Amino acid sequence: MVTINDLHYSDPIDEDNIINMRIPLYDLEVDDQFINHNVPDLKAFQVFPNVWVVPERYTFYSTMKNLDAPANPSRSSYYDPTYLQSDAEKEVFLQQMILLFKRINSTQEGQQFLNLLSRSIPVPYESNGDVAMGTTQVIKQMDDKGNVLKHRRAHIIIYGPGPDLMAKGSKALTKSRETGRGCMAEIYFSPMYHKTYSTKLTNKNSLVDKSVQEFVPDPAVTLIHELCHGLHALYGIDLGNVGSWEFNSNPNSLFSSWFSSKEAVNFEEVMTFGGEDVKVIKSEIDKKIPGILNLIKTTVEPIINKITDPHDEMLQCLQSKYPSLKGTLGQFFFDDTQLEKDIRDLWMVMNETMFAENLKALTRARYLVPKVENIVQVDILSPNVYTIDKGFNHLSKGFKGQSVSQSYFRKISALARGAVVRACPNPHFSSQRGLSSCIEILEDDLFIMSSKDSFTDTDFSEPSVGPVSYKAKKGADTILDSTLSNYDFSKEINFTSTVPIITVEDPLETDEDVPVISEDRTVYVDDYTTFHFLEAQKIGKEVVPTQTKVVFTTNMEEALFDSKKVYTVFENTASRINEAGTGIANGMMFYQWLKGIVQDFTEEATQKDTFDKISDVTMIVPYLGNILNIGNDIRKGDFMGAVELGGVTILLEAIPELTLPVLIGLTIIEDELEKEQVSQTVYNVLDKRDEKWEEVYGFVKQQWWWMVHTQFETRILHAYQALNHQVEAIKANMTYQLANYRGNQEDKELLEKAIDDTLQSLYYAVDQAMHNIKRFLIQSSKSYLLNQMLPKTKEQLLAFDQQTLRNVNDFINKNQGVLGESLAKDLKKKVEKRLTSLPVFNLEDLPISEFEDLIHSHEIDIQDSEVLNIGVNNGKIQDLSGENTPLTLGENLHIVNGRDNQAVRLNNQLDSKLEIQSRPNIHFTAFEDFSISIWIRCSMLRNNRNRGQKYTIIQQFNKYGWQLAIQDSVFVWTLHDTFNNQIQLTSGSALTNKNYLLQNFWLHITVTNKRSEKSRLYINGVLQDQKDISVLGNCHPKEPILFSIQDNSDPNYFVRFEQFNVYRKALTDSEVNRLYWKYFEGSYLRDVWGERLTYNRDYYMQLSTLPGRGIKREYRTWSGFDYIILSELGTQKIPTHEVTYPKLYQGQKITIHSDGKNLEPHVKSNKNIRLKIDDFYIGVVNPFKLPEWRPESGAYVVTTYNHAEDLCLYFRTRSSSQSLYYGQLIMNDGRNKSLLNYTLKGSTYWIWSSAWYYENYNTSSKTAGNWYFIPVDEGWKED
């Protein structure tokens, strides 16, 4: 594990970890137009070996000298010339960087990554037999007079930000960054200033809490992105010049007016970001691999084999850097397969997305996110804000710690709004559409599509194929390793403080990246666009919601030119809002109006329809075309009809001009060859042909991803904008009605809360709607690839195959004399067969996981919606959900043995209580669905005064709220709203002689509440009762959730509970069932109450078919044996009910012992046990030895015999039921398995072991072989 040094800016220079450093480019022989030669030597801090932090602004180049804001700043930029100028600020910067490195170092993957950065020295140079570092691979340590003291290793140097505080970047300090040699890298970075993004395109969309609409990335993850660039520079595998996608559009073209002009995205950026984008460039990586491997081998092997000292520092570093090096001193060589795997790991695994997963942080799903929402400032040094183990998310689940709404994020105003496109009516065209004014569109809201130029230069030509054995690329088969298990960092390397150097010709990088600044522009249109429809859904900027009622209209043109009107496609929602007169008369009416809005909007926004016209698209969102102006030119107002006619192509803003690969059939060398060489050449051609198909497939995927799928993603974001515009307009109306409320003014505070609740419900509906929209659009994108793009490409490939076939046949014919006629025919058959077998278009190479994640993300896992989990952990009662909810514990609250581990015991006393403090996460709105579940065990009622009395166990109540109570052993769930309306659910009939075990038995209670439908009560996963609750109002006071027994007259009554959970959703029937059964995933046997069966504990035993009769030991004089029989029937009356039940504590106690091979305290199914009664082990005898028995194969009578061990029997246990908690005991005599049960002979119930029973009844719930194990428990009393 790397040790992160704790350093402070005020610490004196120690010539070790704190030095005076000269910037690496200072001595570059160029004029001041490029390098700022006025930069003094800087104080540098080595936070871990070879990684340095310099708390200074990055101002060393001509374009970065001036810290003032430029005249035309880019969007989302922020300038502050005073930042990082004082020693105090430099100390803060240093501590922030140390904290981020400690966070990265907190996981195994992070430790490996930092080890790589520390040990991966650039490959040294050789001069006159000496091996040393080049001058461009080290930094100069200076004295206070400006003299060079020594040269030091520096792999990564991290500075503060340049002039733009929002800009983060890295720079490889040599032009030969792709040569396999490697070089140091500089990073400029700010841990304090961050851009924010919408949660709609994230790496963990389904896990994000619905309240999080916008998030701030974890700065540790952002730093890792830049460090990955540095790692590539150290290995000399930087892909910065390999390829890129251009997004510059022609501003004079109307077609390109709706597409953004963005900076080019190069392959290196995609690799260091990771995620799904990497899959799309995999074919490019496959092509690059052979050249990179060759460069590394030809660079490293000659150098490392010049080193003669086995203890040499550079030798140790190179061996650590390249675990694929094999051999001994002076004779090192690379294992090609392992080297390829290691390089693929560095490219494909070490990236921002992987580390975001590793650190459990939210990040973008795509590198090319269309829009930065805001910029924020945050102090991560506060432990209440950011921690080493969890970053921002240390106090909450659902990534709420990264929500921009958190108080510790301070929004700051960017200097630029970004470029604007003004869409104005064409002055030379008399439009009948009524276009009369301009609208403004932000550049960042435009569609994104890579230009055709990004793909036109791709070269698919191949050199002539020869007989040299050819190794096909197998990159797709490589298993990537995020833990870098092939690397061994256990051996310490003591880095020397002085590095020998050689002056070499290795020019430093002098190119600078100049950001693309988009300019404002005007375009002239003849018809309405998507952006006009979006504009029509916005409220006018001049509208004051408290003074003006916003009217909803289904006429887009009317809304576009009237700021007080908003266009909508949701007619029911519009009617409900528009028909409400100004000033609602009373609180109940206002509340019902709000509730109706939620119901109408949710129903209309989440609508979807099945779709069978296109095989790849299974559902459609019918209103999508009308809110985004899609398909109106084909079937106005009929989006489904338009898609049926035009296919998914109509969803594109522009049909891209795709580049078809230019393919020429493979050619073959003309040399004279021997028979084996001719055959090998033919096989090489076939392998090369398959590889060419894969290469072209990859090319098609790239074009689809960057020219087609980006348009579908923009549609997704436009849909999200439209739905949010609808919510904002509804919010304005609610504000207007509240300002003009005519009822009791004291109600206003409650109505404000109700409006907040309504907004949360509306945003939840938007989220549900977006799941449908994403599913539809992503399926459509995939359909376009498979049905529009792929067939055209296959035509090219088939023509390529035909030409290749002719070339191969010509080659075979020319060499028939060498091959012989028979072998020539055989080769031709193999060629024809191979070329008729088409390589499959591999969907796994698509970002297919994105499709599956988005399609199924509405199926949120139960655990992901959990917001509270009260249980016992290490002897402490606490919230186990990760939310750390504050608890108040009464003095008479006890921790006892529970169903699985430990439980909480409530006594019927005032100081026996548990309060769960209310917080937003468990305080639901009047419209939010929620569920609760709990394992609970209530002791037997023994006081007659409790008959008919309802007593409460759990509640969140203060004049209104919810309660879980018991009445005559029946569970009662109550919801009571603020208007004094209530509903009650019950768990069934009262106690009878059949369900007497409902008392003192562990039961799983679940209540689900779907506010627009029903509340449902379940016991052990089975539905007991359900009622409509759509008419109820708010049932959630801000009171704590209280566990306390109230209104019970029995002072000895108590309740045990564990696993009290609250979920922010209404669990479905299947989820309730799954939640119950997941508690039985272990193989433990359970006693009659539901707790784990325990070794060395006393139990009564009864058969489930003969309750009230326990086993006992009885001596029979005529045989001289003690036998195990069933006792007489015992009964008991429950004091509080007219119920007589079979006694449980009947017969004699037995003790369970293990077979001596088991160390666990609890009994598992399929384990061997021994049973002891009266200090005698239970055994068996053959029944034919007894006079009144007939011989029967595989049958034994159970007995005991003094203390003799020869009759001791090992029974194998088996769990028979998970709901009634009984088990079976099986004996194996070596020939037959027999089941322990009973048989009635005369008046005696004999216990015996029968093979016939096992064969016929071993799976029946009614068999006489199912045994209850009954421990004495204080919750169950018998006379």
UniProtKB/Swiss-Prot annotation:
Pfam families: Peptidase_M27, Toxin_R_bind_N, Toxin_trans
EC top class, as a word: hydrolase
InterPro entries, per the entry: Bot/tetX_LC (IPR000395), Clostridium_toxin_transloc (IPR036248), ConA-like_dom_sf (IPR013320), Kunitz_inhibitor_STI-like_sf (IPR011065), Toxin_rcpt-bd_N (IPR012928), Toxin_trans (IPR012500)
A Gene Ontology BP annotation from the UniProt entry: proteolysis
Recorded catalytic activity of this chain's protein: Limited hydrolysis of proteins of the neuroexocytosis apparatus, synaptobrevins, SNAP25 or syntaxin. No detected action on small molecule substrates
Chain intervals for the UniProt region annotation (Belt): 476-525
Needed cofactors: Zn(2+)
Source superkingdom: Bacteria
Region (Translocation domain (TD)): 435-843
Keyword ATP-binding on entry: no
Motif (Host ganglioside-binding motif): 1250-1253
Gene Ontology, cellular component aspect: extracellular region; host cell cytoplasmic vesicle membrane; host cell cytosol; host cell plasma membrane; membrane
Region annotation N-terminus of receptor binding domain (N-RBD): where it falls in the sequence: 860-1080
Biological role: Strongly resembles a botulinum-type toxin, with the appropriate domains and residues to have proteolytic function, although its C-terminus (which binds to a eukaryotic host cell) is different enough from clostrial botulinum toxins that it might bind another cell target. Might be a precursor of a toxin that binds to an unknown eukaryotic cell receptor(s), and be taken up into the host cell via the endocytic pathway.
Similarity annotation: Belongs to the peptidase M27 family.
Known partners and oligomeric status: Might be a disulfide-linked heterodimer of a light chain (LC) and heavy chain (HC).
Protein name: Botulinum-like toxin eBoNT/J
Organism of origin: Enterococcus sp. (strain 3G1_DIV0629)
Lineage summary: Bacteria, Bacillati, Bacillota, Bacilli, Lactobacillales
